[in-house]
């Protein structure tokens, strides 16, 4: 044979490369099949009566005009909830906390129904719907409180029959700091003259907050879920800009107002974290018993907290006695479905 030629026309130093190529192809096929199996198992873990009716790319929410989006969000607004305030009862730490936790628990029932009506929300996996609500529920309650209190300087309108000032906040240990932050946010809303259409957009942005992506389901569909949330958030942001343009603001003023509104959301997040710590403290001190749904939400939020994920909880931590997450099903899931059914029955009545 001539130099460089071998019998069969295949050089030994090339044969190994071809074998590695075939090996890589087999590994890629095995990985693809394993991913499909994992996805199928994940879907089986979450049997849901709330079936996803549309693919993410064909979601009706993404085809809505700005005016249609505003109309949908306004129609989704929950009903007014009254407190169980009794003027004959004295105002003390226990009575105030009982009033507020009872009110929050009943508002949470309506919040679930509201979230289901936010365009694009039900197109997410049920597991991710639950996670988003678990992480944002107190922020949603607080931004609603701030909005209701706009016309009451120096006071917070928790319900139509429950208007509290700073002196009432001092009754509860550690609550006055949160009370002052809520008053400051309400004052900011009033100064900016936030309108109802802008408020419902902000509340929906809180629900779909991109900072919560780390808590979404770890499946092959998670990327699609995140992309869908991005698209819905873009749609809501465009709706906000449309509202500002209709009000006659220049483009520069629109951008400035949008930035100011979104900056308030970081303040709402900070208040929510403070409120969660305070509520958990009240729970540990047995100041007031927490209702089922409120307790589930509190436990779930703490289980998702970055601090809780970063280090294992201590055996002495009261959190261990409050809730134990299920390895296959989230503890809030049955409550999530049941509360929605209860809300639907109340609306039918």
UniProtKB/Swiss-Prot annotation:
Biological process terms in GO annotation: cellular response to estrogen stimulus; estrogen receptor signaling pathway; regulation of transcription by RNA polymerase II
SMART domains: HOLI
Similarity remark: Belongs to the nuclear hormone receptor family. NR3 subfamily.
GO cellular component: chromatin; nucleus
Primary site of residence: nucleus
Function: The steroid hormones and their receptors are involved in the regulation of eukaryotic gene expression and affect cellular proliferation and differentiation in target tissues.
Keyword list, A-Z: DNA-binding, Lipid-binding, Metal-binding, Nucleus, Receptor, Steroid-binding, Transcription, Transcription regulation, Zinc, Zinc-finger
Ranges annotated as biased composition (Basic residues): 12-24
SUPFAM superfamilies to which the protein is assigned, alphabetical: Nuclear receptor ligand-binding domain
UniProt organism field: Anolis carolinensis
Molecular-function GO term, any one: zinc ion binding
Domain of life (superkingdom): Eukaryota
Regions recorded as binding DNA: 1-5
Domain commentary: Composed of three domains: a modulating N-terminal domain, a DNA-binding domain and a C-terminal ligand-binding domain.
Subunit structure: Binds DNA as a homodimer. Can form a heterodimer with ER-beta.
Protein name, as recorded: Estrogen receptor
Domain NR LBD stretches: 65-301
Keyword Cell inner membrane: no
Region ranges (Disordered): 1-38, 306-327
UniProt-annotated location(s): Nucleus
């Amino acid at each position: 044979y001539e130099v460089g030629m071998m019998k069969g026309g295949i050089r030994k130093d090339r044969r190994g490369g071809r074998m590695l190529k075939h090996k890589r192809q087999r590994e890629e096929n095995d990985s693809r099949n394993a991913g499909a199996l994992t996805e199928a198992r994940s879907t089986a873990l979450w049997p849901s009566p709330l079936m996803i009716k549309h693919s993410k790319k064909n979601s009706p929410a993404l085809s809505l005009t700005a005016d249609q989006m505003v109309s949908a969000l306004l129609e989704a607004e929950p009903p007014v909830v009254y407190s169980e305030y009794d003027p004959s009862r004295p105002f003390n730490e226990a009575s105030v906390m009982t009033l507020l936790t009872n009110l929050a628990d009943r508002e949470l029932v309506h919040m679930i129904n509201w979230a289901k009506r936010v365009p694009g929300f039900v197109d997410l996996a049920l597991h991710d719907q639950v996670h988003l609500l678990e992480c944002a529920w107190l922020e949603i309650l607080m931004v609603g409180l701030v909005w209701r209190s706009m016309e009451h300087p120096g006071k917070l309108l928790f319900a139509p029959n429950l208007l509290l000032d700073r002196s009432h906040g001092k009754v509860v240990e550690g609550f006055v700091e949160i009370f002052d932050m809520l008053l400051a946010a309400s004052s900011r809303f009033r100064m900016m003259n936030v309108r109802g259409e802008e408020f419902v957009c902000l509340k929906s942005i809180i629900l779909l907050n991109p900072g919560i992506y780390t808590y979404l389901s770890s499946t092959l569909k998670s990327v699609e879920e995140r992309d869908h949330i991005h698209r819905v958030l873009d749609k809501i942001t465009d709706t906000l800009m449309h509202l500002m343009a209709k009000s006659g603001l220049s483009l520069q003023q629109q951008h400035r107002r949008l930035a100011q509104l979104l900056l308030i959301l970081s303040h709402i997040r900070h208040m929510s974290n403070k409120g969660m710590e305070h509520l958990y403290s009240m729970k540990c001190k047995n100041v007031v018993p927490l209702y089922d749904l409120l307790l589930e939400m509190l436990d779930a939020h703490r289980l998702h907290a970055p601090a809780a994920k970063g280090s294992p909880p201590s055996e002495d931590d009261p959190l261990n006695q409050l809730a134990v997450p299920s390895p296959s099903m989230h503890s809030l899931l049955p409550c999530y479905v049941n509360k929605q059914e209860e809300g639907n029955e109340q609306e039918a009545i």
